[in-house]
Each structure stands twice: as structure tokens, then as C-alpha cells.
UniProtKB/Swiss-Prot annotation:
Residues 22-32 are annotated as: Important for interaction with STRA6. Its main location: cytoplasm. One of its GO terms (molecular function) is retinoid binding. Forms a beta-barrel structure that accommodates hydrophobic ligands in its interior. It comes from the Eukaryota. The gene is Rbp1. This is Retinol-binding protein 1. It is found in: Cytoplasm; Lipid droplet. Disulfide bonds: none annotated. The keyword Cytoplasm applies. One of its GO terms (cellular component) is nucleoplasm. Belongs to the calycin superfamily. Fatty-acid binding protein (FABP) family. The lineage of its organism: Eukaryota, Metazoa, Chordata, Craniata, Vertebrata. Disruption phenotype: No visible phenotype when mice are kept on a vitamin A-enriched diet. Still, mutant mice have impaired vitamin A homeostasis. Four week old mice have reduced levels of retinoids in the liver, due to more rapid vitamin A turnover. When mice are kept on a vitamin A-deficient diet after weaning, they gain weight normally during the first 5 weeks, and then stop gaining weight. It comes from Mus musculus (Mouse).
Length: 135
């Protein structure tokens, strides 16, 4: 049985986010705005089908996928690229590989207690975010 990621999560910390955005070639103005945001995550999980909504006052991003199946991810509004994305289970963690222009791009997501941990990677840069479950 997979881990239950269902819930609404509020950001607690966001380490190295601006460097991560720089590695994705996000322009300086957008990096500065994005770095000020504290987005929430709303996750709806039905077995291996997931919808992850990243919600902020500036922009929302919705990722709708089936674990284990590759899909084309449109990152318009983030770094305006498309990539082929696969999310898979690695024990109790979700591992995402995003194949495209940027080397080593992807993320890992897991739960510790009532906290959601998200580690995003691109071009050797790692950003660590932590969210607390609110419901």
C-alpha cells in the first residue's frame, strides 16, 4: 500500500530555492517574486493516481499523473519548458525524473510525521522544502 499523501500542506521552509530557479534559467525578476512566495500544496491521491496542486497568490501549478507512467509535463509559468516526466515509488518516497533540457532534473517527496518533504534537483542544485499538514 502506497503512502497516503492526501491533504492540504502549508510551507514551513524553502531552502536554496533561488539557486534552484537560477539553475533552471528563470529570469531574475521572476526569481525574486517566486522567492517571496510561500505556496501551499493540495494533494489528492487515489491509489497511484495523483493530483498535486501548488497554490500561491502569484500563480498556481497543477500536476496530474499516474505513478509509473511517463507523460509530457508542460512547465509553462515555471521555466517555460516541456519535459518527459516519470514519477515512481521508491519505498515510501515518490521519485520524479524530468527528462529535457536540464541535466539531473527531478524531485523526491516523502512524509515524516505531519510534515511533507520535497527535494527538487536541477543541474546539481538542490532545493529543500518542508510543508506541514493542516488537513
Amino acid at each position: 500500500m502506497p503512502v497516503d499523501f492526501n491533504g492540504y500542506w502549508k510551507m514551513l521552509s524553502n531552502e536554496n530555492f533561488e539557486e534552484y530557479l537560477r539553475a533552471l534559467d528563470v529570469n531574475v525578476a521572476l526569481r525574486k517574486i517566486a522567492n517571496l512566495l510561500k505556496p501551499d500544496k493540495e494533494i489528492v491521491q487515489d491509489g497511484d493516481h495523483m493530483i498535486i496542486r501548488t497554490l500561491s497568490t502569484f500563480r498556481n501549478y497543477i500536476m496530474d499523473f499516474q505513478v509509473g507512467k511517463e507523460f509530457e509535463e508542460d512547465l509553462t509559468g515555471i521555466d517555460d519548458r516541456k519535459c518527459m516526466t516519470t514519477v515512481s515509488w521508491d519505498g515510501d518516497k515518490l521519485q520524479c525524473v524530468q527528462k529535457g533540457e536540464k541535466e539531473g532534473r527531478g524531485w523526491t517527496q516523502w512524509i515524516e510525521g505531519d510534515e511533507l518533504h520535497l527535494e527538487m534537483r536541477a543541474e546539481g542544485v538542490i532545493c529543500k522544502q518542508v510543508f506541514k499538514k493542516v488537513h
